[in-house]
A protein has these predicted regions:
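Extracellular ligand-binding/catalytic regions of CAZymes and related secreted enzymes
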Residues: 56, 69, 73-97, 134-211
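Phosphate/NTP-binding elements of NTP-utilizing enzymes
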Residues: 128-134
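A short, well-structured beta->alpha microelement
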Residues: 1-7
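Structural motif
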Residues: 13-23, 58-59, 162-166
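Structured loop/turn residues at beta-strand edges in well-structured enzyme cores
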Residues: 10
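A glycine-rich, often tryptophan-bearing local segment used as a flexible ligand/cofactor-contacting loop or short
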Residues: 23-124, 136-138, 143-145
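Structured segments of extracytoplasmic/periplasmic soluble domains
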Residues: 18, 49-53, 188-192
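Surface-exposed charge patches
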Residues: 48-49, 131, 153
Length: 211
């Protein structure tokens, strides 16, 4: 709807982009471009304009880095506008996450998202590890507990803010944590508080995969 011009983003202050497990799906025969890409050109342009006009973006999804890492144009958009970069796929098997910014979340949180069969929530088997784009001013605000790979980043800018998660928000198992995280993100967008802090680059546990 946004790409087709049916929704005017100027009517909104913040945008929640839910990509879930969406990724490019090729046709069986080379008759057309792959469908369901993360950030097709028209949508990326609309989000770019939204941010540059002061709009905030909360983005989550399992393939938000993997799906665009080999496309220079979409990668430039992710790094320069949303302020995140792909680091790895298959970033965690168990889905355990911890937060790393008390200024944003109010306190340290440990939670899990679903990666396997669940009767009520689909499993995100192959989430992305994402990190702050180089020289972007963004920072890691969540990590995967099993290896300390960056799981989410936030950008506190002069014109707009972003929070980017490399796993689907809706896959977080406990509603209590979904509520707490969403409230913290919306408060960050609404109040524009400064969340910049000096945090160890390797998180609170040691691993050969630390950034």
């Amino acid at each position: 709807a946004v790409s087709a011009g049916l929704v005017d983003l100027e009517d909104y202050r913040s945008l929640d982009i839910v990509y879930g497990e969406q990724k490019a799906t090729p046709w069986p025969k080379p008759v057309a471009e792959p469908r369901f890409r993360v950030f097709p050109v028209e949508f990326a342009q609309a989000v770019r304009n939204f941010c540059l006009q002061g709009g905030n973006v909360f983005l989550s999804g399992a393939y938000i880095g993997t799906d665009l890492k080999d496309d220079p144009e979409r990668r430039e958009f992710a790094e320069n506008i949303l302020k995140y970069a792909w680091r790895t796929d298959y970033a965690t098997r168990g889905g355990a996450v911890y937060t790393q910014n008390a200024l944003l979340f109010g306190k340290d949180l440990d939670f899990n998202f679903v990666t396997e069969f669940h009767p009520k929530i689909y499993g995100a088997e192959n989430p992305d590890g994402i990190e702050a784009a180089k020289n972007s001013g963004a920072q890691t605000v969540m990590r995967y507990a099993e290896n300390n790979v960056s799981a989410a980043v936030a950008y506190n800018g002069e014109e707009y803010n972003t929070v980017i998660m490399g796993f689907p928000f809706e896959c977080i198992e406990e509603r209590e944590y979904r509520d707490m995280l969403m409230k913290a993100i919306l408060d960050f967008f609404e109040n524009d508080q400064d969340i910049r802090q000096n945090t160890p680059k390797d998180g609170r546990k040691k691993s050969s995969l630390n950034n």
